[in-house]
Regions:
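Short, recurring structural edge motifs at helix starts
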Residues: 2-5, 145-146, 171
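A low-complexity, Ser/Thr/Gly/Pro-enriched, surface-exposed linker/loop concept
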Residues: 135-143
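Extracellular loop and loop/strand-boundary signature of outer-membrane beta-barrel proteins
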Residues: 32-33, 143-147
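Elongated, acidic membrane-bridging lipid-handling scaffolds
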Residues: 1-130, 136, 152-155, 161, ...
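Nuclease catalytic cores
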Residues: 183-185
Length: 185
């Protein structure tokens, strides 16, 4: 006999300062200067998290700040977002990522669905919309894709999107660099 969960959890704040996390699978080879999920070494970990409410049918949480440096050279200066969700809708607000020379911002992202199990499969019933603004220097991603290490020019991206399931509509797509190149569609 299944019983309904009475889950009701609240955590006002979790603070992490000057944290350090290492993870090694000793049987796997190391790849200095390149991200390797088998050998992680995170230092200067800082986080401010808040779980306003977690219930069996809803979530309200905020990541005010997460930052760290990873041994491969990747540095997350700031990650932040607010998320609310229930059985029919997920809202992400003030999503932001800042790297050494890169900033990405999504003011709001909304996903609507008929039931929560549909969300991971992105069925046709899952509808979404949002907008994204970013200034990216691809070199910041070189620890994951070494070929990007030579790309030091900023690229500005502006994107407005919506869709359902795996169908994406982008009425606004602009990509520009600081030398006058602009691609719009």
């Amino acid at each position: 006999v299944k019983t309904k969960s009475n889950l009701d959890l609240r955590i006002n704040s979790v603070l992490i300062r000057r944290g350090r996390v290492t993870y090694d699978i000793l049987s796997e080879p190391e790849t200095p200067g390149k991200f390797n999920a088998h050998h992680l070494s995170v230092k200067n970990l800082a986080a401010t998290l808040s779980l306003k409410a977690l219930r069996s049918d809803s979530l309200n949480a905020a990541i005010r700040r997460v930052s760290f440096d990873e041994q491969c050279g990747f540095s997350l200066q700031k990650f932040a977002m607010k998320v609310t969700a229930n059985n029919k809708r997920l809202d992400i607000k003030d999503f932001g990522v800042e790297l050494s020379n890169t900033a990405l911002k999504i003011d709001s992202l909304t996903l609507k669905y008929d039931s929560l199990p549909e969300l991971p499969q992105m069925t046709e019933n899952v509808r979404y919309d949002g907008s994204l603004k970013a200034s990216v220097i691809l070199k910041d991603l070189a620890p994951f894709v070494p070929a990007l290490s030579r790309f030091e020019e900023p690229l500005d991206l502006n994107l407005v999107f919506s869709g359902h399931g795996k169908h994406l509509d982008c009425p606004t797509l602009q990509l520009a660099n600081h030398h006058g190149l602009m691609i719009a569609g």
